[in-house]
Amino acid sequence: MDQSNRYADLSLKEEDLIAGGRHILVAYKMKPKAGHGYLEAAAHFAAESSTGTNVEVSTTDEFTKGVDALVYLIDEATEEMRIAFPMDLFDRNILDGRMMIVSFLTLVIGNNQGMGDIQHAKIYDFFMPPRAIQLFDGPSKDISDMWRILGRPVKDGGYIAGTIIKPKLGLRPEPFAQAAYQFWLGGDFIKNDEPQGNQTFAPMNKVMPLVHDAMKRAMDETGEAKLFSANITADDHYEMLARGDYILRTFGPDADKVAFLVDGYVGGPGMITTARRAFPNQYLHYHRAGHGAVTSPSAKRGYDAYVLAKMSRLQGASGIHVGTMGYGKMEGTHDDRAIAYIIERDSYTGPAYHQEWYGMKPTTPIISGGMNALRLPGFFENLGHGNVINTSGGGAYGHIDSPAAGATSLRQAYECWKAKADPIEWAKEHPEFARAFASFPGDADMLFPGWRDKLASHR
């Protein structure tokens, strides 16, 4: 059934829809299956994503038609399809009237992903009008809160050197806490790896007191504050809350130094919102394990990593992993810096839409996946700043001297970039950074050919 007369209006102007402030706009790359016209398929897609079904139904009235989603732009050659969704379509909380990401996802990327006439459809950007921005929670904490704890300026406080406890699984409580202590002697921030929680060989009620003790010892020894991101992800919201409450009790007066890590993709949006609302005084660390199933460029359905990051800010994530922008082991390109810019700035023009955030707190880009001191200067140069959290697991624990030396080398890499120094020359005066060359010789050979001869007299 051709529904283009009802669910498409190509005379609509995007600038008018934005100025009106009554629609959420979504940009897709969509391809129909063979034998289906582009506009016909696009209109069917909009119908399935809003008020329509596969036949005309007698219960439809004029009000219903007033909240139809409308295709307003198509370009078959580039697979471009843009749809305007009336704000009234989206579900609201009965408790406080606020919007929810689950409703957004249900409509814009729900049943339409299994339609028989669609080869593929993937969201690459969306626009939220001012009223929608007001109706999402947004972050309660941001990187400025971390800088404040670390004793830094709350504006441009700079790089937070972090790690992930490695190996990701298999450490019992005492070795786990010792690994944390060793890194904290040189670094700022430690996070649980996403599978770490309450394994039988490392129960949380034994691990967390030891980690707090390690934190206190490291703070006493270095005179610096330390930060820990504890994984509270669970299937059950009550279990997640119980974990969070236990951790806060355990850390006691140092609870402000604890972030809560939630695996937001596998756990779902409800886990992020529950953590945001139950623990507004904690930094909310959004881990995105599994996201590549839909965000990878090789995946033709779902949504891009840019879209995931943008949604995370609406939900209230204080920080989210954004990959390594082609500088680490994770899939990505240098242009992925746009993922960082959309969540950290108050205004940004993305691949399809300009988005204003109207003062919503920023979400911190968290950099992780194959990064070490040698890769960081180029990363910072591409991003244009160092106001990020970086969690380097192998980059710290793989340092030839010690995890503390690995942490120090990460800090020195940031200082090298800030000073606009040549990394080889910088290494001659910074021993931990210099030893990173020997620790990661494959990277050193790739990034700094001839480094062995240049550093030979400074070993």
From Swiss-Prot:
Signal peptide: none annotated. GO terms for molecular function: magnesium ion binding; monooxygenase activity; ribulose-bisphosphate carboxylase activity. The modification N6-carboxylysine is found at residue 191. InterPro entries: RuBisCO, RuBisCo_large_chain_AS, RuBisCO_lsu_C, RuBisCO_lsu_C_sf, RuBisCO_lsu_fd_N, RuBisCO_lsu_N_sf, RuBisCO_lsuII. Its EC number is 4.1.1.39. The record marks 329 as: Transition state stabilizer. Binds 1 Mg(2+) ion per subunit. It catalyses: 2 (2R)-3-phosphoglycerate + 2 H(+) = D-ribulose 1,5-bisphosphate + CO2 + H2O; D-ribulose 1,5-bisphosphate + O2 = 2-phosphoglycolate + (2R)-3-phosphoglycerate + 2 H(+). Its cofactor is Mg(2+). Pfam families: RuBisCO_large, RuBisCO_large_N. Substrate binds at residues 111, 168, 288, 321, 368. CDD domains: RuBisCO_large_II. Mg(2+) binds at residues 191, 193-194. The keyword Repeat does not apply. The active site is at 166 (proton acceptor), 287 (proton acceptor). Homodimer. HAMAP family: RuBisCO_L_type2. RuBisCO catalyzes two reactions: the carboxylation of D-ribulose 1,5-bisphosphate, the primary event in carbon dioxide fixation, as well as the oxidative fragmentation of the pentose substrate. Both reactions occur simultaneously and in competition at the same active site. Belongs to the RuBisCO large chain family. Type II subfamily. This is Ribulose bisphosphate carboxylase.
